[in-house]
């Protein structure tokens, strides 16, 4: 058995780990998007005063890195934010919900411009 370090073998191993990581992240991103859509439907069904649900952040923005431990970011307009918090608690993902009317104006405009409308009435 040789004690020599095989640089090519190390590079191949690192490449395989990297590809596996990115494959896992891509699958998890898609699963998070589907979960966000389902949560938006449930939010709108459960609260007739809710007007719009947006998804934003790394789950929805391809230009942002997504990690397997990334969370789902949702913004709502109208509705009961506390009821929304309770509803998303059961998700397998960590979910952050913000009331867009309570956000700083620039942040709210960014969500409206770049976010994905997941549901609206």
Question: What do the predicted segments below correspond to?
Answer:
Residues 1-54, 60-68, 77-121:
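Catalytic core of pol beta-like nucleotidyltransferases
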């Amino acid at each position: 058995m040789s004690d020599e370090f095989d640089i090519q073998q190390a590079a191949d191993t690192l490449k395989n780990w990297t590809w596996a990581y990115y494959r896992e992240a891509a699958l998890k991103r898609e699963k998070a998007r589907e979960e966000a859509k389902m949560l938006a439907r449930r939010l709108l069904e459960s609260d007739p005063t809710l007007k719009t649900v947006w998804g934003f952040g790394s789950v929805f923005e391809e230009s942002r890195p997504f990690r397997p431990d990334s969370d789902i970011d949702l913004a709502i307009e109208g509705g009961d934010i506390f009821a929304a918090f309770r509803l998303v608690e059961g998700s397998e993902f960590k979910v952050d919900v913000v009331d867009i009317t309570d956000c700083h104006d620039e942040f709210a405009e960014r969500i409206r411009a770049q976010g994905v409308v997941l549901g609206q009435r």
